[in-house]
Amino acid sequence: MADMEDLFGSDADSEAERRDSDSGSDSDSDQENAASGSNASGSESDQDERGDSGQPSNKELFGDDSEDEGASHHSGSDNHSERSDNRSEASERSDHEDNDPSDVDQHSGSEAPNDDEDEGHRSDGGSHHSEAEGSEKVHSDDEKWGREDKSDQSDDEKIQNSDDEERAQGSDEDKLQNSDDDEKMQNTDDEERPQLSDDERQQLSEEEKANSDDERPVASDNDDEKQNSDDEEQPQLSDEEKMQNSDDERPQASDEEHRHSDDEEEQDHKSESARGSDSEDEVLRMKRKNAIASDSEADSDTEVPKDNSGTMDLFGGADDISSGSDGEDKPPTPGQPVDENGLPQDQQEEEPIPETRIEVEIPKVNTDLGNDLYFVKLPNFLSVEPRPFDPQYYEDEFEDEEMLDGEGRTRLKLKVENTIRWRIRRDEEGNEIKESNARIVKWSDGSMSLHLGNEVFDVYKAPLQGDHNHLFIRQGTGLQGQAVFKTKLTFRPHSTDSATHRKMTLSLADRCSKTQKIRILPMAGRDPECQRTEMIKKEEERLRASIRRESQQRRMREKQHQRGLSASYLEPDRYDEEEEGEESISLAAIKNRYKGGIREERARIYSSDSDEGSEEDKAQRLLKAKKLTSDEEGEPSGKRKAEDDDKANKKHKKYVISDEEEEEDD
C-alpha cells in the first residue's frame, strides 16, 4: 500500500481538498436531490419503462441482496464506533461552515430521498459483492462521496447514514481481501476511464486508500466469520426496501450506466477470480448467480459492451471457476479408458451380466438304489465284473501277467474265488431272475460278512465325513446326480488260511525274493577222457617213485661194499655146490652185469624192438628209464614200495643171471 500513498497522498491532503470541494458541490447536490426526489415519486413508471425496454433489474442480474447483506452487516460491525466518530467530526465541520438556514431547510427537505437513494446504492453494493463487488463499489462510492461532500448536512443526518455507509464499507472489505495485484489492476482500470473527471478519480483513490488503511487488519479477522455467516445471516430488508432500492438505482443517467458498464464487467470478473479460493458453498452460490446473470445479460444487448469478449478472454468466465473438491472436474488419468460421456470406465456403474439360459429337455432317469447306499473302495484282492456273466464270451484270466485296474493299482489275478459276478437266468416258470456268486450276511451281533464262493471276508462299516462322494449317472455328455454317500464299507480276509490271504502273501514273497540267475546241474556219470588223464598222471607218479627207490638202494649197497671184506666176497665159490638150485651172486658177475646191463638197457630203450612185445615189457622199460633220470634226485621212497621193487629186481636178476650162466656153460 506504499504505492497507493505515493500516488494519492495521505489522509490530511484528502481532508483539505474535501473542504475546498464542499462549496462547489452544493449546487450539484441540489440538482441531484431534486432529480432523486422526482425519480423517487415516479419509480413505478420508470420500472414499467425499464421492463418494456428489456433491461434486467439488479435483483435479476445479481440475485437477492439479502444473501451478502448479512455478511456486510457482520463484517462492518466491528468498525462501527470508529467510523461513526469520523462521520460526526465531518458533520461538525460542515455545520460550522454552512450558516445559511435556507440551505439547512433545503437539505432537510431533501433528506428523505437522499437517504433512500444512499440506502439503495449501499444495499446494491452489498448485493453486488457476491457477483460484481468492484463495479457497484465504484459507482456507489462516486455517488456517496458526491453526496457526503455536502457541508450542510446535520449531525442527525450523518449519524443516520453512518450505518448504511458501514454496510457499503463492509462490501469494500471483501474486495480488499484480494491480492495487491488485483487492487493495482483495479486502480489502473479506474485511471484509464476517460469519462471521469480528475476530481472524481482523486476522490475514488482517497476512498480506496482510506478503506485499505482502516479495514485491512479487520478483513483478515472477519474472513472466517463471513464464511460461517453466509448461510446463517439472511437479508433483513423488506420488500418495500428492495423496491425502493431498485427505484433509486433507475434514476441514474444513462450516460453514467454506459460509462460504468465496462468497469462493472471487469470488476465482476476480477471479483470472481479473486474469490476462487473461497469455500465450496460460496463457489456453488456464485455459479447459480452467474447463471441467472448470464441469462439476463443475454436478453439485454444494451447492457453488454462491445469489448466484453476481450474482457472474457482476459479474465475468464464464471464457468472457469473450479472447486478443488469436485471429483467430476478432474481430468481422466492418462492411459485410462474413457467412455463416450467422458467418464472413466471404472466410475461407470457395472451393469449385471444377463444370465444365459438354454432350455433343453432331458429324460429323467430313475433308478432303484435300495434303502441303504454304501461307498466301497475295493481292495486289490476283490474285483467286480459289471457285465453279466455269459459262458459264451467268458475269457479266462491271464496267469502270467498282473492285471491293472482303471485306477492303476496292481490287482491279484482275477479268479473265480475273488471276483464278484452276476448273471441273468430263468426260473422254472420262465421269469428272468438275477443270480450272483456273492452275498452279504448280517449276523445277530450286527456284524456283516461277504461270502464270495468259498471265501469269506469281514465287512466293516464307517461313516463318511463331508458331502464329497456323490453317485452320478452319465447321460450323454453330462452327469445326473442320484444320491450322496454317507457310509463306506471296507473288506478284510476272514482268516489267514484263506486262499486269498495265501495269494497275497505269495505275491509279496515273489516280489521280495531274488531269482538265481546261474544254476549248477549235478553230473550223473564220469567223463572217460578225464578219467584216462587222471590214470596216466597216477602211473607216472608211481614210476617216478620206483625209480627213486632203486637209485637209493643202489647207493646203499655201494656203501656196504666200501666198508670192508666179507665172507661172500672172499669165498665166492664156497656155497656153490650147496646152493646150486638157489640164487647165488658173485662179485664178478655183479660187476659184469652192472656194466653190461646198463648198455643193454639203454639199447633196449632206444631200439626199434620196443614196439614189439607185451605191454608189461613196455611198462618195465619205462620204469627203468625213469629210474635212470631220477638217480640224481636222491629222493627217499617208502619202505613198502622199496620191497616190491627189490622183489621185482631179484626176479629179473635171477633171470638175467641164469641167462649169463647158460651162456658161459655153452
UniProtKB/Swiss-Prot annotation:
Entry-linked PANTHER family: LEO1 PROTEIN, RNA POLYMERASE-ASSOCIATED PROTEIN LEO1
Phosphotyrosine: residues bearing it: 606
Cell location: Nucleus
GO cellular component, one term: Cdc73/Paf1 complex
Main location: nucleus
Gene Ontology MF terms: RNA polymerase II C-terminal domain phosphoserine binding
Keyword Nucleus carried by entry: yes
In-chain residues carrying the UniProt-annotated modification Phosphoserine: 10, 14, 66, 151, 154, 162, 171, 179, 197, 205, 212, 220, 229, 238, 246, 254, 277, 279, 294, 296, 300, 607-608, 610, 614, 630, 658
Record's protein name: RNA polymerase-associated protein LEO1
Family, per entry: Belongs to the LEO1 family.
Subunit (UniProt): Component of the PAF1 complex, which consists of CDC73, PAF1, LEO1, CTR9, RTF1 and SKIC8. The PAF1 complex interacts with PHF5A. Interacts with TCEA1, SUPT5H and CTNNB1. Interacts with SETD5.
Compositionally biased spans, kind Basic and acidic residues: 70-96, 119-178, 193-218, 239-285, 547-561, 636-648
Compositionally biased spans, kind Low complexity: 32-44, 316-325
Pfam families (UniProt xref): Leo1
Disordered: region residues: 1-361, 547-583, 602-666
Keywords annotated in UniProt: Acetylation, Activator, Nucleus, Phosphoprotein, Transcription, Transcription regulation, Wnt signaling pathway
